[in-house]
From Swiss-Prot:
GO cellular component, one term: DNA-directed RNA polymerase complex
Keyword field: DNA-binding, DNA-directed RNA polymerase, Nitrogen fixation, Nucleotidyltransferase, Sigma factor, Transcription, Transcription regulation, Transferase
DNA-binding region as annotated in the record: 394-413
Gene Ontology terms describing biological process: DNA-templated transcription initiation; nitrogen fixation
Domain of life: Bacteria
Disulfide bonds: none
Name of the molecule in the record: RNA polymerase sigma-54 factor
GO molecular function: DNA binding; DNA-binding transcription activator activity; nucleotidyltransferase activity; sigma factor activity
Protein family: Belongs to the sigma-54 factor family.
Gene from which this protein is expressed: rpoN
Compositionally biased tracts (Acidic residues): 73-86
Sequence motif RPON box, residues: 483-491
Length: 513
């Protein structure tokens, strides 16, 4: 068969994952900290990007510019960009001029083009901003003027000159101090430490024995039993019976009191006294010291009560990055560059990337607003009455309601938080599995059922401990159709012991009390 060359025309459509589209998808699932770091990197690479400072916002407010009013949950949001958009209107117009030259259509990525809502929630945001580390820099917090507490490392180093005189021993001690975790436990291998410091193993062991006498008692322990033993020794309470107890903490965790009485050689009354002594100890002695900076969770959305009794859903302005495109700088540089030069090509690419980024951030804010509003509409009973009234909800229900893809909702709810009158919750918290009703009524959420189980266990007495079958019967009377194995699974997930172990523990605690 002879080979021949021919030319054929074929028309087809295919989905192409462009770099801009990948960036938009990544922005959706970033939390506030990741987004801030990403924007800082983009600003370093793109000279046309800038972040609006709080002083610029204040001057804008003095000129009379105002943002849009908050929308009530479940209400329609006006189409198009308004005067109170998060980003500069010039940026949006420039983005529209460049959209024809991009590989992807924004309508395919973000089907909705509604405007994000920005407003202040005085009550809830005031509570959140009063937390340490949540200040916006415009007001003073008395906590900022309080002297910071000592860290565990500083407290231990202060005790070194009074305990160790040898310079080599102090070097070993400083190395061991650096190996402590925040709880005060030592995870370093002594043989490896001796080899690394070119010291004798006996010297390392001798230094460790001295360090284990430092305050707070229990530091430099390698296990929980050793930590409790060090604290008991400091109280002069480490007798053979107590030493046997801390050496068999696994039996204590299983509530195997009969075996503990036999191993410790004590009667039930003495064992109860030993339990009371153990309860006074600190399993993490290092946590009482300053451990460094804490990462403050910044809510992406805020929910507060509306004047008419409904709910107002607002985006947290502190979580919205104010990224703008400097068109004046672009025009000034363009006048001094030839159109075909490499500098002009670089500027055009920077302008295109900057406009894409600002619009992607704008669409991210709008998407978060729509998802948060729908969650509030679906979980209205939770906001009014608490966890026991949390409804079963899945991603598809929210996606269908806001006419977006299920994967988009999943990305938006990852690592995003909403401040409600009942506390700060991750958006994923509101999505729970469904448990059927025993009387063909409304389904119950798994989280609300777990809350009921926890409440029943907390309210039981030592003489009336509920078994899994008893919990099933109570839930069925309340209209929850649930199997015994499901109750056992929920109980174990919440680290609730079995009824036999709870009965032993409650009776022991009743005698101690």
């Amino acid at each position: 068969m002879a080979l021949s060359a021919s030319l054929h025309l074929r028309q087809s459509q295919s989905l192409v994952m462009t770099p801009q589209l990948m960036q938009s998808i990544q922005l959706l699932q970033m939390n506030h900290l990741e987004l801030t770091q990403f924007i800082a990197q983009e600003i370093e690479k793109n000279p046309l990007l800038e972040v609006q400072s709080p002083s610029d916002e204040a001057s804008t407010a003095e000129r009379g510019d105002s943002g849009p009013q908050p929308e009530e949950a479940g209400s329609e949001i006006d189409e198009g960009a308004g005067e109170g958009d998060v980003y500069d209107s010039a940026t949006s117009r420039s983005g529209e001029r460049l959209s024809d030259g991009l590989d992807s259509d924004f309508a395919n990525v973000f089907p909705d083009d509604t405007t994000p809502q920005r407003a202040d929630a005085p009550e809830l945001l005031g509570q959140w901003k009063s937390m340490p580390g949540a200040s916006d820099g415009e007001s003073y917090d008395l906590d900022d003027f309080v002297a910071s507490r000592k860290t565990l490392r500083e407290a231990l180093i202060e005790q070194l000159p009074f305990a160790l005189e040898s310079g080599s021993h102090r070097l070993i001690a400083q190395y061991l101090i650096d190996q402590l975790d925040d709880a005060g436990y030592l995870h370093a291998d002594l043989a490896e430490t001796a080899q690394r410091l070119a010291s004798a193993s006996e010297d390392v062991t001798r230094v460790l024995d001295v360090l284990q006498q430092f305050d707070p008692p229990g530091v430099f322990a390698r296990t929980l039993g050793e930590c409790l033993g060090l604290q008991l020794r400091a109280r002069n309470r480490l007798d053979p019976a107590m030493e046997a107890l801390v050496g068999n903490l696994d039996l204590l965790a299983r509530r195997d009191f009969a075996s503990l009485k036999k191993i410790c050689g004590v009667d039930e009354e003495d064992l109860i006294d030993m339990f009371a002594e153990i309860r006074k100890l600190d399993p993490k002695p290092g946590t009482s010291f300053e451990t460094g900076s804490f990462e403050t969770i910044i809510p992406d959305a805020v929910v507060r009560t509306a004047p008419d009794g409904g709910w107002l859903v607002e985006l947290n302005p502190d979580a919205l990055p104010r990224v703008l495109v400097n068109h004046e700088y672009f025009a000034e540089i363009s006048r001094s560059c030839r159109k075909s030069s490499g500098e002009q090509i670089f500027l055009n690419e920077c302008l295109q990337n900057a406009n894409w980024l600002t619009r992607s951030l704008d669409q991210r804010a709008r998407t978060i607003m729509k998802v948060a509003s729908e969650i509030v509409r679906q979980q209205d009973a939770f906001l009014m009455h608490g966890v026991g009234h949390l409804r079963p909800l899945n991603l598809r229900t929210v996606a269908d309601a806001i006419k977006m893809h299920e994967s988009t909702v999943s990305r938006v709810t990852s690592n995003k938080y909403m401040l409600t009158p009942r506390g700060l919750y991750e958006l994923k918290y509101f999505f729970t599995a469904s448990i059927g009703s025993a009387e063909n009524g409304d389904a119950h959420s798994a989280e609300s059922v777990r809350h009921r189980i926890r409440t029943m266990v907390n309210q039981e007495s030592a003489d009336a401990v509920l078994s899994d079958d008893d919990i099933v019967d109570i839930l069925k009377k309340a209209g929850v159709d649930i199997a015994r194995r499901t109750v056992a699974k929920y109980r174990e997930a919440m680290h609730i012991p079995s009824c036999v172990q709870r009965r032993r523990e409650k009776r022991a605690l009743a005698r101690v009390g």
